């Protein structure tokens, strides 16, 4: 479930199809002062700086924040544990609207396989940034 100014969304699935879903929506605006420093890893700062320079019309910092929110929302139902903003390192593909979240802490086991990452998709349109993660129930490896 997610909501922000002018937008609300929920996602549901059968447990036999998906083991977890993470969904977040944010306004496509720059993050408030000092928020970025609280959430960004050194590796993320490198790609973020590059994308903000190459494509300044997009709020890449907000996309990073949204992706981390989706990671947490996918993580918590599997573990029942808190995941800090710096406990996952996000990489973004600007070309195809995907992102990967590499877990920097031990991940949960799904179907006997320990997850080391989550794969997600993102979209920026109509003043919103939306990110989503869906882990299939038949996952046979890291996702």
Predicted regions and their residues:
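Core catalytic alpha/beta fold that binds nucleotide/phospho-ligands
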Residues: 1-143
């Amino acid at each position: 479930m997610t909501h922000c100014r002018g937008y609300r969304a929920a996602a549901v699935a059968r447990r036999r199809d998906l083991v977890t879903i993470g969904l977040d929506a944010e306004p496509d605006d720059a993050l408030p002062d000092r928020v970025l420093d609280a959430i960004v890893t050194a590796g993320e700062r490198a790609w973020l700086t590059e994308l903000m320079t190459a494509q300044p019309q997009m709020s890449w910092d907000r996309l990073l924040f949204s992706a981390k929110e989706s990671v947490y929302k996918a993580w918590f139902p599997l573990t029942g544990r808190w995941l800090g903003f710096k406990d996952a390192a996000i990489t973004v593909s600007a070309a195809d609207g995907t992102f990967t979240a590499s877990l920097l802490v031990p991940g949960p086991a799904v179907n006997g396989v320990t997850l080391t990452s989550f794969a997600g998709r993102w979209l920026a349109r109509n003043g919103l940034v939306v990110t989503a993660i869906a882990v299939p129930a038949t996952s046979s490896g890291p996702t």
